[in-house]
């Protein structure tokens, strides 16, 4: 199985990819479970194996971060990579072993698993929620629904904090038009596994039918949201105990700036924003320094 992270490259990680997630070792454990466990207990056994891999991966990240305490960007990317690896592996196991296709039915034709929100940005703290979109056709088959159910039970049994939705492309667009929170979460989408063509169609239609038509409205909404957030935090920049996430000049302000630029520029990467003149390279470098500090 090839992991399909669109953003996270091995040179962005704080520790070795192989040490963090040993797929060969996991496959061996899964094969042993298949041979020794009753089918009714197999899903639980898979969850236990992946839970151990998650614990070991987190310990490795913690150990490396203690050695490199200022490498915050690499650390949050590594937590995201670990979750990518676990989710992609779980999907592969579910759709080939627990819910193997019958006749010519191919699961990849009907489902794509997408990271959204903070997870979609590949920015995860140790206890961040894992926000997932199970993208399906308008009427998913019973088998696809069972795959999603098995996936969720495995992830829940691993004690991951899962936020999820199961939607078609049109449902995502319609909900994004009426709910700013959903719209922003969809702005930060990233392919994990499943049908890449379905994901690419989703990406194109979001940009054409949701983001492109509502840039001015989105900017106004975000600026109003920022003003209300500052007021709730007291409206002061200098405080004895600042809220580094929600306060004035905090992490959420930096994220809002990035969201607005990404939305207006119709850009997927910071390079596209720089090429279009929304940031200079120096401004973006300063942005990263501030972001990493927070």
Segments from the language model and where they lie:
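A nucleotide- and high-energy phosphate-metabolite-utilizing enzyme signature
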Residues: 1-294
């Amino acid at each position: 199985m090839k992991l399909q992270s669109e953003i996270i490259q091995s040179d962005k990680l704080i520790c070795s990819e192989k040490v963090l997630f040993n797929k060969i070792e996991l496959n061996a454990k899964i094969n042993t479970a298949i041979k020794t466990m009753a089918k009714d207990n197999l899903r639980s056994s898979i969850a236990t194996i992946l839970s151990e891999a998650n614990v070991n991966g987190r310990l490795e990240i913690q150990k490396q971060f203690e050695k490199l305490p200022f490498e915050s960007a690499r650390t949050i990317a590594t937590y995201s990579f670990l979750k990518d690896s676990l989710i992609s592996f779980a999907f592969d196991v579910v759709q080939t072993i627990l819910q193997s296709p019958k006749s010519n039915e191919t699961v990849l034709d009907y489902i794509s698993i997408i990271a959204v929100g903070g997870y979609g940005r590949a920015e995860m703290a140790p206890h961040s929620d894992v926000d997932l979109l199970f993208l399906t056709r308008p009427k998913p088959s019973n088998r696809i629904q069972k795959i999603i159910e098995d996936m969720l039970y495995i992830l829940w049994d691993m004690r991951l904090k899962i936020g999820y939705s199961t939607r078609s492309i049109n449902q995502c667009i319609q909900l994004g038009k009426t709910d700013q929170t959903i719209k922003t979460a969809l702005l930060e989408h990233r392919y994990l596994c499943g049908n890449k063509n379905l994901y690419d169609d989703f990406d194109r239609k979001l940009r054409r039918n949701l983001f492109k038509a509502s840039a001015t409205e989105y900017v106004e909404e975000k600026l109003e949201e920022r003003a209300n957030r500052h007021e709730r935090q007291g409206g002061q920049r200098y405080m004895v105990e600042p809220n580094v996430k929600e306060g004035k000049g905090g992490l959420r302000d930096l994220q809002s700036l990035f969201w607005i630029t990404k939305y207006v520029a119709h850009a997927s990467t910071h390079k596209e924003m720089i090429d279009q003149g929304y940031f200079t390279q120096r401004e973006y470098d300063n942005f990263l320094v501030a972001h990493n500090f927070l």
